[in-house]
């Protein structure tokens, strides 16, 4: 059994489990998000301010799902900060956002924009969005923000295993804001954003985690090069991907 695999192999194992073994992607996502949420809940109580930073892919979808699970556990100070082109959101991400918005306790999602491109930049550390508050400066039920608000706990769900090129543009600014506000505790979902999940290299900028909750198998990017310095404590959580899927992935992409 391969206990450490590359991010590329992990992604291939996910696809094999979904496409060949017919395991629903949302089932895997629900399990992964629940494991990450349970880890956070074991460390911090329902009164904790938690900011979940999400990209538009399935790592971001994990983050949104995690937020909804925490709401269901009685956490009421959960905020979502989104980054990326809405047109590039995955089907799973959109499903998780609809599920989030269906919860009466949800807070208004915040959409990060670079300060240079925002026509009316705000001051750093805007006030937290209140549950069910009306959006005041964006269509689609979102609040546009050029800065991230301070928080007690930061959840990094931006890139996960999918990053293999330098971080640029609004994503670089987003990660820089995450680095700026990081204070008490940061949990990375699967892989700290900015770390190449295969090589462990920093792709221009990366977010320092205190704990990385990674799914199925540990990733080579967490133990190679600069990966260990950014991953913090590495916790591997089983999410129901069969060994057959990992074996197929390693055959397809030998490291």
Regions found by a protein language model. Give the residues of each.
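YjeF_N-associated NAD(P)HX repair module
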Residues: 2-5, 150-255
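Generic serine detector
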Residues: 10, 25, 33, 42, ...
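Small-residue (G/A/S/T)-rich helix-start motifs and N-terminal tracts that mark the onset
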Residues: 1-83, 90, 94, 211, ...
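Nucleotide and nucleotide-moiety/phosphate-recognizing core
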Residues: 37-124, 128-129, 135-158, 166-189
């Amino acid at each position: 059994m391969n206990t450490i695999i590359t991010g590329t192999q992990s992604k291939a194992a996910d696809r094999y489990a979904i496409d060949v073994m017919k395991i629903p992607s949302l089932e895997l996502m629900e399990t992964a998000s629940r494991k990450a949420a349970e880890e956070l809940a074991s460390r911090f109580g329902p009164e904790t301010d938690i900011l979940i930073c999400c990209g538009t892919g399935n790592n971001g979808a994990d983050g949104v799902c995690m937020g909804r699970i925490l709401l269901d556990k009685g956490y009421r100070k959960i905020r979502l900060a989104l980054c990326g082109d809405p047109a590039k959101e995955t089907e799973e991400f959109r499903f998780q956002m609809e599920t989030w918005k269906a919860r009466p306790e949800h807070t208004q999602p915040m959409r990060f924009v670079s300060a240079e491109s925002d026509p009316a930049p705000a001051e750093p550390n805007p006030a937290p969005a209140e549950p069910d508050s009306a959006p005041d400066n964006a269509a689609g039920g979102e609040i546009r923000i050029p800065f991230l608000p301070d928080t007690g706990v930061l959840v990094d769900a931006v890139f996960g295993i999918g990053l293999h090129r330098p971080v640029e543009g609004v994503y670089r600014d987003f990660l820089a804001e995450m680095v700026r506000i990081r204070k008490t505790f940061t949990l990375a979902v699967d892989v700290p954003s900015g770390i190449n999940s295969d090589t462990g290299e920093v792709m221009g900028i990366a977010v320092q985690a205190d704990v990385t909750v990674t799914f199925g198998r540990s990733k080579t990017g967490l133990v190679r090069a600069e990966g260990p310095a950014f991953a913090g404590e590495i916790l591997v959580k089983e999410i129901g991907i069969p060994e057959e899927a990992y074996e197929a992935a390693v055959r397809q992409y030998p490291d």
